[in-house]
Structures are given as C-alpha cells and as structure tokens.
Swiss-Prot record:
Protein known as: Ribosomal RNA small subunit methyltransferase A
Organism: Chelativorans sp. (strain BNC1)
InterPro entries: KsgA/Erm, rRNA_Ade_diMease-like_C, rRNA_Ade_Mease_Trfase_CS, rRNA_Ade_methylase_Trfase_N, rRNA_adenine_dimethylase, SAM-dependent_MTases_sf
Localization terms from the record: Cytoplasm
Keywords linked to the UniProt accession: Cytoplasm, Methyltransferase, RNA-binding, rRNA processing, S-adenosyl-L-methionine, Transferase
Residues engaged in binding S-adenosyl-L-methionine: 27, 29, 54, 76, 102, 123
Pfam families assigned: RrnaAD
Functional summary from the UniProt entry: Specifically dimethylates two adjacent adenosines (A1518 and A1519) in the loop of a conserved hairpin near the 3'-end of 16S rRNA in the 30S particle. May play a critical role in biogenesis of 30S subunits.
EC assignment: 2.1.1.182
Stored SUPFAM superfamilies: S-adenosyl-L-methionine-dependent methyltransferases
Catalytic function, reaction form: adenosine(1518)/adenosine(1519) in 16S rRNA + 4 S-adenosyl-L-methionine = N(6)-dimethyladenosine(1518)/N(6)-dimethyladenosine(1519) in 16S rRNA + 4 S-adenosyl-L-homocysteine + 4 H(+)
Length: 275
C-alpha cells in the first residue's frame, strides 16, 4: 500500500491495463512525492474546489486529496481510467467527482459551481495543454472563475508562458499570460518521473490572475499578437499590415522598425486599443 492507503500506482496501471496512449498526449506521473509537491505548490486546498484535467490513473488526484482538497472534479476522456478513479472516489467519499468527457468541450466554470475558491491543477495532456491555457487566459469577463492555476507543461512551453520582452521564448503566449496574470516556473520534473518517459523535461507553472489588468478587448489583443508574432522576424510595419500597419503604429506611438519580441505587454495593449 502507498502512503494514502491505496495500491501503488504501478499496480493500478497494470491491473487496469492503463498503458499511456500517445494519441491522447498521455504521460503518467507515478511519484507520489512529486504529485504532492504539485499539490503543495497550488496551496490552500482545504476549502478549495480543484479542477483537474487528464487525471489518468489518478496520481495527482490522490495527492490533491491527501493534501486536503475539499472537492476535486477530475475530467477524463480515456474511459479505461474511470474504474481506477472510481476506486479513489470510494476511498475519499464525497470529495472526488469524476467527469467522463473531453476537456476541450467542458464548461469549467459550470463544473466548479458556486465554490468561492477554485483552483485548476493538472498535469495537462501535451496535445491540448496550450490551447486550454489560452482559453483560461482569455475569457471575456475578468477576474476569472478560478483563483489560481498550477499546471505542468513541457519545459519549452513553460518558458514561453513566463517569457519577458527580448527573450527568444517571448511570443503570443507570454503576452497573453503577462497581460492578465503573474506566472512563474515553480520547479522542473525529469523525464524518468513519468511512464512512458517523455523526451523532454517538464515544468510546473504557477499562474495567479491579476486583480486589475490593463483594459483591452480580448479579441483585439489576440489579433494584434497573432499578426505581430506570425512574422516575428519582420519589422512591425510589415507584420502588422493586416491590422492597420503604419497608421496603427503611429496612433499607438510605436516605432514601426521595431520587432514584435521587443514590445512590452503594455505596448501590445496600446496597439490593440487602436485597432
């Protein structure tokens, strides 16, 4: 038995035939010490509702419950994993809700319900992680329904999330994250911690919404960053032609010979406001 009184994860995986599926972007994290570290990074779980995407056999799910999460809502697309998750639910009566379905189609705010303290904590499937994050960063209304996000990504994606102007990693994702949130890399996780081991290092990122971000319409900022970084090697007067080009830059007071990676979040907001 493991420290939580449940069978070791390797036994659970073998018993239920849960080999990871590449098509679903699965890499199972088996080390309960690491999953508990993720849960502790999220912090303040005692009165929280936690939304978890892609729990798989439930390693992180177990850690969240061990660390005191009042309620965990686990969204799992892989039907093979449901039985393993139901065993965890039986061990923690009334605290784990399993949602069998596609996270890309989920209404996360509705799943959270009227809970005051909502946290998103997940070892996100690699093939949908970035798309989900952008959705969580760009709702029309702000502050969002969640208090924080503690998410695992490939290291390269994590670096893009926290990147600052002038960095080779700085791009659309860094602007969207920097606009409305404070994001930091909490720690790295080596490939050997997973089964099967991925080819890259993973990183856990802690993201906390800003209470009062700069005001701009979401769609305008999205179009501006998409155009600017779609041709990041070109000067802004060329890359931004589709959204206003020289006239837009002049209204925003930004030199058209600059490149996208040199602009601060505040400057991107200025541009977007003028579209």
């Amino acid at each position: 038995m493991s420290m939580d009184g449940l069978p070791p994860l390797r036994d659970v995986i073998e018993r239920h035939g849960l080999f990871a599926r590449k098509a679903l972007g699965q890499n199972f994290l088996l080390d309960l010490n690491l999953t508990r570290r993720i849960a502790r990074t999220a912090g303040g779980l005692d009165n929280a509702t936690v939304l978890e995407v892609g729990p798989g056999p439930g390693g992180l799910t177990r850690a969240l419950l061990m660390e005191g999460a009042r309620r965990v809502v686990a969204i799992e697309r892989d039907e093979r994993c449901i039985a393993a998750l139901e065993e965890i639910a039986a061990h923690y009566p009334g605290r784990l809700e399993i949602v069998a379905g596609d996270a890309m189609k989920a209404d996360f705010a509705a799943l959270a319900g009227n809970s005051g303290d909502v946290k998103i904590v997940a070892n996100l499937p690699y093939n949908i992680g970035t798309e989900l994050l952008i959705r969580w960063l760009t709702p029309q209304t702000w502050p969002p329904f969640y208090e924080s996000m503690t998410l695992m990504f490939q290291r390269e994606v994590a670096e893009r999330i926290v990147a600052k102007p002038g960095s080779s990693h700085y791009g659309r994702l860094g602007v969207l994250a920097g606009w409305r949130t404070e994001a930091r890399i909490a720690f790295d996780v080596p490939p050997q911690a997973f089964t099967p081991p991925p080819k890259v290092i993973s990183s856990v990122v802690k993201i906390v919404p800003r209470a009062d971000p700069l005001t701009v319409e979401v769609g305008r900022l999205a179009r501006t960053t998409e155009a600017a970084f779609g041709q990041r090697r070109k000067m802004l007067r060329q890359s931004l032609r589709s959204v206003g080009g020289e006239a837009l830059l002049e209204k925003a007071g930004i030199d058209g010979t600059r490149r996208a990676e040199t602009l601060s979040v505040e400057e991107f907001v200025r541009l977007a406001r003028e579209i």
